[in-house]
Amino acid sequence: MKLTCVVIVAVLFLTACQLITADDSRSTQRHRALRSTTKLSMSTRCKPPGSKCSPSMRDCCTTCISYTKRCRKYYN
């Protein structure tokens, strides 16, 4: 019985600590997660938006527009 009470109190204490630290860390993140297109462009060599491209080569950081044969621009 005593062991059960100790375990319950420990779990409640740890949960409270996590909630307190989660509240403190709001809006203090220095390096926000990058968008997946930005990650892709940073990890691979690809052509920037507006460059000439080939739809079959997949050489753009974004996508290749087939009728203009240019890499699509980023949208915010």
Swiss-Prot record:
One Gene Ontology term, aspect cellular component: extracellular region
Record keywords: Calcium channel impairing toxin, Disulfide bond, Hydroxylation, Ion channel impairing toxin, Knottin, Neurotoxin, Secreted, Signal, Toxin, Voltage-gated calcium channel impairing toxin
Secretion signal, residue range per the UniProt entry: 1-22
Residue pairs linked by disulfide bridges in the UniProt entry: 46-61, 53-64, 60-71
Pfam families according to UniProt: Conotoxin
Tissue: Expressed by the venom duct.
Compartments (UniProt record): Secreted
GO molecular function: calcium channel regulator activity; ion channel inhibitor activity; toxin activity
Primary site of residence: secreted
Propiece residue ranges: 23-45
Keyword check for Repeat: no
Modified residue annotations for Hydroxyproline: 49, 55
UniProt similarity note: Belongs to the conotoxin O1 superfamily.
Miscellaneous comment in the UniProt entry for this protein: C.moncuri is a vermivorous cone snail.
Entry's free-text remark on domains: The presence of a 'disulfide through disulfide knot' structurally defines this protein as a knottin.
Name used for this protein in its record: Omega-conotoxin MoVIA
